[in-house]
Amino acid sequence: MIFKVKFEVTQMILTSLINKSAKALVIVAFVAAPFLAHADDAQKPAVHVTYEPQLDNQRDPNQYCAKCHKFDKIDKNQTLDQSGGELHFGKFHGAHLDKKNPNNGKAITCVSCHGNISENHRRGAKDVMRFEGDIFGNKKPMYSVQEQNQVCFACHQPDKLREKLWAHDVHAMKLPCASCHTLHPKEDAMKGIQPKQRVKLCVDCHGEQQKRKAEQDKLIEQKDKL
């Protein structure tokens, strides 16, 4: 009888110890789980997250520019494909809109001529190509003649331009293309004027050049007399 009681007591003690041990193991496993997971993650290669902004209208870069450079004199519901080459972004006309680069066959977009914008573009950063044709202005252009014309030469090859008109041989290297050609022509790239009237463009430019030279010579002469 005494042996039986001792055996039952011993069994109860063992059962109690086993239950306590099991509970302790559960607690340890619960506490250690985050640390074990962290250690496992530490062994994995680091994942570098790169921010890649997704631009709307990726298939039509012109629409992305048009978000800020609003349409003018055109139905806002009209798409670029329906514009008939008369799309306006302020002063923009779309003769180039339906064209492709003859050298690579890619469609011409705003980016083709003006380049990609930076993240500061919307804050007013002057980070795109600007074509300035006022050769008599006092303000220095943002981009040199060579930089401006190289953009045009990406499609309009200099050799072919010289063959088409002798004036390109001289002027294309010293003057910006924009001084004679409109940037966003509706039809004719040559200031939108008729061929018979184009000579007036030459006369006006060279006349102004001679006038300014005469004024400069007069000032020099007056200084010499002082």
Swiss-Prot record:
One of its GO terms (molecular function) is oxidoreductase activity. Binds 5 heme groups per subunit. Keywords: Electron transport, Heme, Iron, Metal-binding, Periplasm, Signal, Transport. It holds the Pfam family Cytochrom_c_NrfB-like. InterPro entries: Cyt_c_NrfB, Cytochrom_c_NrfB-like_dom, Multihaem_cyt_sf, Multiheme_Cytochr_ET. The keyword Iron applies. Heme 2 binds at residues 110, 113-114. GO terms for cellular component: periplasmic space. Heme 5 binds at residues 202, 205-206. It is found in: Periplasm. SUPFAM superfamilies: Multiheme cytochromes. Pathway: Energy metabolism; nitrogen metabolism. Heme 4 binds at residues 177, 180-181. It comes from the Bacteria. The keyword Coiled coil does not apply. Heme 1 binds at residues 65, 68-69. Heme 3 binds at residues 152, 155-156. Residues 1-39 form the signal peptide. Plays a role in nitrite reduction. PANTHER family: CYTOCHROME C-TYPE PROTEIN NRFB (PTHR35038:SF5), DISSIMILATORY SULFITE REDUCTASE SIRA (PTHR35038). NCBIfam families: cyt_nit_nrfB, PRK11659.1. This is Cytochrome c-type protein NrfB.
